[in-house]
Amino acid sequence: MGKLLFGKLVFKKSLFLLSGMSSLAVFLTACGATKIFDSSVQLLVSDNFSTLADKSFSQMSYEGIRSFFKKSKGVDLPEADSSQLQEGNGLWKRPGFTLSDRIATFNNIKNDGSDVIVATGFNQQESLQAITSDDIRFQSDKESLAKTGFIFVDGAIEKEFNKRNGVPQFKSTPTNISSVAFRSDDGSFLTGVATAVYLNLNQEYFLDKSGWSTNSSNNNELTVSGFVGIALPSTLSFLNGFRLGIAYFNEVIYKHLSDAQDSSAQVTTSKQTVLKQLQVANGEKRIKKIKWISPKQGSDGETINIQDHQSGSFSDTEPRAITIANNLIDKGVNAIIPIAGPQTNLVVTQIARRQAHTAVIGVDSAQELLDINIDAPNKDKLKMGNKKIIPFSSIKALDVAVESILSTLEKGSSQNGYQGFGYNNIGTVKNNSVGVSEAGYEFLIDPVFWKNTSSMQAMSLSASLKANAASSSDNKKKLSEVATKKNENGSTKNGSNDIIDKYAKLLTKSSSSTSMRNGSSDSNQQNFKTTDNDGDWTIVGDELGKYKSSELPIFTGSSSYPTFQTEAQNVLDGGANVASTQGFKWSFKQI
C-alpha cells in the first residue's frame, strides 16, 4: 500500500543520492529481455521485487493500459500472465534500486520509443520530483525527458518536495506528469456497508462458535475489527471509512430493515422498519447491528486505543499480526480487515488453522482472487458469497484511473473526471476508482432503498431524503426486492442514478446537507446521528477519534489523520505550459 496520500508525505524519505550521471547510467543499466514489443505506453512497476502478474498493484495498472488500447485502438495487448511478457521486452520494466537507477530507467523506456511511462507506487515520487525540478544536477535528465509523459499512480506531485526546516529537497514544475491518489476512505465506506450485510445474511454461520475461545462474550453478536501495519494517514483512512460504513449501516440502514430489536413503545406502527428484512432461513434471527471489537484482551469499552490496532510493520512475517489475529478469533470476531499489506495472508492462515468462522476483508485489490484465499471452514454453512475466507475487498481501481488518464491525454480533454499533465487527480467513488470489489456487489445494497430517489439527479441526496421523508414508510420491501449493485436492473453497469452513484452523492458534501452529528448543535455530543434526518455522511478524516455509538467506540492515541482534496488539483504555477501530446504515437505492435 502506498504511504503517500493526497500530497501529504507519510513515509521516511530515502537518503538523497546524486544522479547527475544518470544519462551515462542509461548505458550501464541492464535491459532485461530482448525487446519484442513497440508500445507508446510502458509500465514501470513499483520496485525491483515487483512483478507484472501479481493480481494486485502492477497488474491492475497494466490492465488500465490494456483497456485503453482495446477501447481506443481496438488492439489486444497480451494478458499480464502471458509468457510473452518478460521484464524489459517493451511493455514493462523494473525501476532499479536507487534514485539514479530510476531516472536511468526512465531514459531507457524513452529510448525504447515509448511516449508515456505509467509509474506505479509512492517510491517513484523522488525521481519524478527530481526530473521536473530546478536542481541543476538533474537538468540533463529534465531536458531529455521533457517530451515524455508520466502517469504517477497512487501518489501526488508537490511543488515543494520533502521540506525540512522550511527547505525543500526539490522545487518542481510537473508539466509532463499527471498523478492520481485515491479516496480509499470513501471506498472502504462501501465495503463497511457490504460487510454488515454479508454478516447478517450469513448469521447462522457467523453466530456459530467454531474456532472461538470459550471465554468469548460475543456469542450472540455480529462483530468486526481491523488493524493497520503502521498508524499512518493512508492506513487510518481505510480504517476510518470502513468503520463509518458500519456506522451508516447501524444508524441509518438498520432502521429500515428490521423491527425485531426496535422499542415498539417508542415507535409508531407507521414508523416501524421494513418487514423481516435480512433474516435467516428459520425466520427467527433478525438483522443485527455490527459491533467493533478491540484486539486487546479486556478493552472493549467506550474508548479503545489505535496502538492496539497496529502490528508495527508491513512485514509478511510480523509476529504481532499473528497475535492480533488470534486475539480477535478468541473474541469471536466475525470479520477482520487487515490494512497491512501481506499480513492478510497471516490472518487467513490463522483462521484456517483454527477452523474459525471469521471472514477477512481484502484491501487495495481484489484479494479474494489471490492464491492465498482458500475455502472457509465449514463453507457449506455459508448461505451467500463465494464461500471463501476472503469474500470481497475494498479496492483502488487503478485500472480505471490509468485508462481514464491515458484517454484524457489522447483526447486532450477531461475523461471520467480525470485531468492531464500538471494535475494531481483523485480516485473517488464518483469516478468508479474506489469501492468494493465485484464479488461484494451482491452485498452492496441501495443506501437509500426506502426512498423515492427518481429525482436524485436534480437534487442533492440529502435534499432528496428530506423531500421523501413523509412517504418513506410506504416504501417497504422484502429482501428479495432490495436492489444490490449486482442485481440492479439486471446489470452491473454503472449509470447516472445507479447504486454507486447514490453512494457518491451520499459521500459528497452539499450546501443543503445537514450535519451527520448531533455535535453540530451541541459540541459535547459525539454520537453518530440517529434521528430521522439521515444527515451528512461526508468523511472528514478524523472520525475515528471523535464520533461513537454503543457499538463503535472512539479510538484514542493517534493524530495522524489524513486531510483530503476531493477533486483534481492543478499544481502548476500560473504561466507554466504543459507538455504537448501531439507527437505521441498511441500505438502498439509486436516486432
From Swiss-Prot:
The keyword Membrane applies. Residues 476-497, 510-535 are annotated as: Disordered. A lipid is attached at residue 31 (S-diacylglycerol cysteine). InterPro entries: BMP_lipoprotein, PnrA-like. Residues 510-523 have a biased composition (Low complexity). Transmembrane segments: none annotated. A lipid is attached at residue 31 (N-palmitoyl cysteine). Pfam families: Bmp (PF02608). Residues 476-488 have a biased composition (Basic and acidic residues). The keyword Nucleotide-binding does not apply. It is found in: Cell membrane. GO terms for cellular component: plasma membrane. It is a lipid-anchor. Keywords: Cell membrane, Lipoprotein, Membrane, Palmitate, Signal. Residues 1-30 form the signal peptide. To T.pallidum TmpC. This is Uncharacterized lipoprotein MG040. It comes from Mycoplasma genitalium (strain ATCC 33530 / DSM 19775 / NCTC 10195 / G37) (Mycoplasmoides genitalium).
